[in-house]
Amino acid sequence: MTIKEFAYSAQQHLEAQSGEKFKRAHIYELLAASFGYNSFAALCAESIVFQGKQASKHSSQHNLDLLRRCAELGYTSATVDIVFAELPPLIAKQRLSIVNIPELISKLRGESSYQNGYPEWDADDYDDEIEDNIIFTQSDADDDYYQDNLSPGLLAGLELAAEKGNSQAHYAIALFLMPDPDFDQTPGSEYWYTQEQGGRVLTGVEKEWADEYVQSINNAQKFEFHLREAGRLGNEDALLDLAEHFDDPSFFEQGSNGENHDPLRVAEIAESLGRIHDVHEWLTKAAEAGDTEAMRRLIEEFDQDDVQRCWSWVYLAQLLDTDLTRDDYYAIHEDGSHYDDDVGGPMYVDGRDGIKLPSLSDDQDALVRQTAKSLFEKMQ
């Protein structure tokens, strides 16, 4: 059942039970209140309503929200009581629940994988731990979290939101479809696809392989479409993924404050695009956030002509318990692993020299130490 169908059914049911007319728009508002939102517009801005596999749980706060919203819409106390008694069971009967899109995106960004067969979602192939945490209701209690398999209904809800210009919905779909770099296409699938395109009639496993290749093409096209749409609508995460996957420089051209991005990842992507200025900028952000390896690289590759700047990185690293001026050498095996005396065998040396910098005057040194201290305090 779609949300539109549910709203119509609920409207008919409540009118029959109360003898009072309900506006269809009010049903949507009451549905939103049942999930803890002040309005249906607020719900749609960050969540997807969909039909799951089990009834969602509602907290006492949700019940209060429903009572409040019903009264705000101008219904009599008798009608409010009927709505309170009748609407939650209707929602439970139809197994309606919500997924918060930002939370869904957060899970997918950490555990995204190649999804074979979209939109026919195969929940059994998805990691159980993610299933147990990814779908939930707006509840203030951990045991009220609603758990459900990722489903065609959820994807349909995301697509509907995407059609209405929701950049986060576009991005969530793109993450569903993001190709896994470790995914290996079945050997021969491209060959059999080419044969079928040439008019050969395939059967059995050859047909399965050709269909698998078609599906991978479709997934890749949908992935790029939704990613580009999310980027076009201003989603910075999507723009960064576009830079990584399609060498699209839009992320860097529009500028970003970097608060929500891993600066080392951004620096790596910038370097792959040959944007050296941006590499410097984002390594600096990483260093200012406390990454000592970024500090070392800045000293060696970017800030080497500014001795005071280099010393500020050295002193900042020291405040973070890292001495960049100390040589760091260690024994390894031939394969590069750290040397194990119990294993024995030939011993090799690996490592790197400590940073060597020209000395500063006392005044310069005091100024640089204060700069490092200020940067350190900003991290706290």
PLM feature spans:
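C-terminal alpha-helical interaction appendages
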Residues: M1-L87, I91
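Helix-turn-helix repeat elements of alpha-solenoid scaffolds
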Residues: D127-I135, D142-G153, D184-G204, E212-Q221, ...
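Alpha-solenoid helical repeat scaffolds
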Residues: E159, R228, A243, T284, ...
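Long, ordered, amphipathic alpha-helical scaffolds
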Residues: I299-Q380
